[in-house]
Design a protein with these regions (language model features):
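Glycine- and charge-enriched low-complexity intrinsically disordered segments
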Residues: 2-34, 94-148
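Acidic, aromatic-enriched beta-alpha/helix-loop junctions
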Residues: 69-111
Length: 148
């Protein structure tokens, strides 16, 4: 390990401790889990990504989401509100959660999240035919942040 890598190794743990607000004991537990080291080693590359969920179907949406609307998230899964529609339906976000989780798991495993086979999810509203109001279907894509 070169000097730069050694320095980063020290800094990253201090940064994570401060970022997560961990006590020394919590940080000890965190560091003892080898999965956390693996995830942190891949975090810089993931943070260069933008997760995009595009509305590919919409009918009767109370929040007025339309086909082509996009919801943007950073690589860690945080909603980038300034890039999203003015109103974002919580039920659409609920549909986004498992897709973002799966895309991050694939990324950490070294697999391109865009290769996900089932990359669509729908809001919880069943649509008017089933006693609801509307329905929105989202499709996930992951791109370089500079392209988003």
């Amino acid at each position: 390990m070169n000097i730069r890598d050694k320095a980063w190794d020290v800094i990253k743990w201090k940064m994570m401790k401060a970022h997560l607000g961990y006590t020394d004991e919590e940080m000890k537990v965190f560091r003892e889990n080898p999965r956390n080291e693996d995830v942190l080693s891949k975090a810089p590359a993931l943070l260069k990504k933008t997760i995009v969920l595009e509305v590919v179907e919409s009918h009767g949406c109370n929040s007025q989401h339309k086909v082509g609307d996009k919801f943007f998230f950073d690589g860690a899964g945080n909603l980038l509100t300034k890039q999203c529609p003015a109103k974002v339906c919580v039920y659409a976000l609920n549909a986004a959660t498992p897709l973002i989780y799966a895309s991050n798991e694939l990324f950490y495993a070294g697999i391109d999240p865009n290769e996900m086979r089932f990359k669509r999810s729908a809001c919880i509203d069943a649509g008017v035919q089933c006693g609801g109001w509307g329905r929105v279907v989202l499709e996930l894509g992951v791109m370089e942040r500079k392209e988003a």
